[in-house]
Amino acid sequence: MKIMFYALRPFDEQAYCEPYSKQYGIDYAYTAAVPTPDNLELAKGCDAVSTNPCLITPEYLEAWAAMGVRFLPCRSIGYDHIPQQKAKELGMRISHSWYPPAGVADYAIMLMLMRNRKVGQILRRADAQDYSLSGKMGRDITRMTVGVIGTGNIGRTVLRHLSGFGCKLLAYDLYPNDEARQYAEYVDLDTLYKSCDIITLHTNATAANRHMIDANAIAKMKNGVVLINTARGTLIDPEALINGLESGKIGAAGLDVVENENGLFYFNHMGDALQNRELAMLRSFPNVIFTPHTAFYTDVNVASMVESAFKAVRAMADGEQTPLEVRL
């Protein structure tokens, strides 16, 4: 049993491969490069191909399947970069990673606090030795209503951690759960939109919820609403977000993800023209905090993501059920 790791980061992920290889009895090979037509052959002799979010085409899957690859363990919670229908046709099985929810949850709360207290502007002005107070007054989160869309592991952790701040909490999910009810009131989306000062997204990306935050949704929100997204970039229509920021309907945004980020994030683009017009525009707003999909990035989470690949392949190869497998 052998896994080919593509886009394996030598400065963090690689250190965890050897111990988990021994623990699960699975060999591995790796490259720091993302999959391309020129390096697909690296997967010859492997039973699994593991990737981070990057460009994966149906043709890549066909080539790997012809080499005998059966498993596609993603080293990320999201798996929307994998052509799922093609994988199903080829009989290839997909899994995603798991890691403790606190890292992303606390990062989302950090973005809320930074936006409320205008930390981005304060730091930029401090870099220019502007230590005046004018324009830096923040808002107190304890007097605000926060809406959490998606109450899975991360969304519930956001609610639990926010409950100590004293703010009012509302939640929306297609499948409400009792743990979240300890901290928040479940409401419909329209009620959440019109009631909340801060809205934070914690739901998976699906075809059904693509651009769920569009012009119509934004029009229903409170004036000056703060939007936080540490989930998936496709949840927000970037054009509607830009229009909302320009009009002042959206008071601020904290974004760790954006649409069409694959191939852009996790690479050094210093000196390059940014190949994402919406992101280039969003970065120009002083009331937007942008980070390049790093909410997950802790030592605990990186170890968990690498282990998830080994653990899922071991279970699927042995015919065991695993919650990490994606049901196609």
Feature locations, PLM:
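N-terminal glycine-/charge-rich "phosphate-binding" loop or analogous flexible N-terminal tail
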Residues: 1-46
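Short acidic/histidine-rich motifs immediately flanking catalytic phosphotransfer sites
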Residues: 42-48, 67-70, 194-199, 222-225
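Phosphate/diphosphate ligand-binding glycine-rich loop within oxidoreductases
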Residues: 46-123, 135-138
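Short glycine-/small-residue-rich Rossmann-like dinucleotide-binding loops
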Residues: 53-54, 197, 203-205, 231-232, ...
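Rossmann-fold NAD(P) dinucleotide-binding segment
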Residues: 56-69, 208-227
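A short helix->loop->beta-strand "cap" motif at the edges of active sites that frequently abuts
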Residues: 66-71, 90-92, 167, 223-225, ...
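Rossmann-like dinucleotide/phosphate-binding beta-alpha-beta segment
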Residues: 136-223
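Rossmann-like dinucleotide-binding domain for NAD(H)/NADP(H)
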Residues: 224, 233-328
